[in-house]
Amino acid sequence: MTLKLGVNIDHVATLRNARKEAFPDPLDAAAICLAAGADFIVVHLRKDQRHIELKDVAQLCKWFPKKIHVECAATDFAQKAVLKYKPHSVCIVPEVPGEVTTTGGLKFTPAVEKRIFAMIEKLHKKHILVSLFVDPVPADLSAAARL
């Protein structure tokens, strides 16, 4: 297996949004990172779109096909977005309203597993690679493996 470099550009969008301007542009940041040798670009699409926005995901996937990795929750909002814009890969992560950053892995319950399984099936039908953000504990690893 070859090690690959992914660069997260979320905070380029955070700065843009704080300025209430069109710059810095995450699309420009992605181009610079890829030109400098990054293998792929990572963005976290949250429901509140506090940094990366739907328009960013759309543009990134359009201009850099096969180079975009989206982190998102197993929500209708995120699922519709990734099925529409078709990034190369998706990591399903937990999302807690008001959290500053993701602090732990998915919490597996039967309902969560069912929802994630359904999302994985839909993503695979669009040839989108899927990973899960899990805590390194046996029960969570087993749950992820079942999916």
Give names to the regions the model predicted.
Residues F77-Q79, K84-L147:
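Conserved anion-binding
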Residues M1-F77, L83-P87, A143-R146:
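Conserved N-terminal beta1-alpha1 strand-loop-helix module at the mouth
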